[in-house]
């Protein structure tokens, strides 16, 4: 018991020490992507393991049907997100989160009548080679 207490006392200051050299300010890369309409991605990613984006899409925007070789999670900041799958279409409103599992066929679109604003987390981070486009859900 004394050894455990001694270990905790010695490790506690180390475990809670703040190393300010690890903090960083991230300036996003702005990407313009042309689907049926142009959308904007603000990419805050700092590694290939994890992507972090803001996505801004106009009214009427839609992607083609895709299968993503990464998990996509996010939250709707403004507008209505539509996720179209083979059997159904799900809609997500402001302050609702969503998860698109890896390798799921989906068409992502703005399902509302105002611009769509999302914050997205991708695991692993985005690479063009990890996105496959399809003509249909079959």
List PLM regions with ranges:
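Sec-dependent N-terminal signal peptides
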Residues: 4-13
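A short, N-terminal "cap"/entry segment at the start of jelly-roll beta-barrel domains
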Residues: 16-51, 130-138
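Ligand-binding loop in jelly-roll beta-barrel domains
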Residues: 47, 102-128
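Conserved short histidine dyad/triad with adjacent acidic residue
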Residues: 51-68
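Histidine-centered metal-chelating micro-motifs
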Residues: 62-63, 82, 98, 102-108
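Glycine- and acidic-residue-biased ligand/ion/polar-headgroup-sensing regions
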Residues: 70-81
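Short acidic-glycine-tyrosine-enriched beta hairpin
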Residues: 88-102
């Amino acid at each position: 018991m004394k050894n455990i207490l001694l270990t905790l006392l010695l490790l506690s200051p180390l475990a809670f020490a703040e190393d300010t050299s690890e903090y960083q300010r991230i300036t996003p890369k702005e990407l313009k992507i042309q689907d049926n309409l142009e959308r904007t991605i603000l990419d805050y990613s700092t590694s290939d393991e994890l992507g972090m984006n803001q996505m801004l899409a106009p009214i009427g925007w839609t992607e083609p049907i895709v299968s993503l070789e990464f998990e996509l999670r996010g939250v709707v900041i403004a507008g209505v997100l539509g996720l179209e799958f083979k059997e159904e279409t799900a809609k997500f409103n402001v302050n609702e989160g969503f998860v698109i599992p890896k390798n799921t066929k989906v068409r992502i679109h703005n399902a509302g009548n105002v611009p769509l604003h999302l914050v997205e987390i991708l695991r692993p981070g985005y690479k063009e080679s990890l996105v496959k486009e399809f003509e249909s859900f079959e």
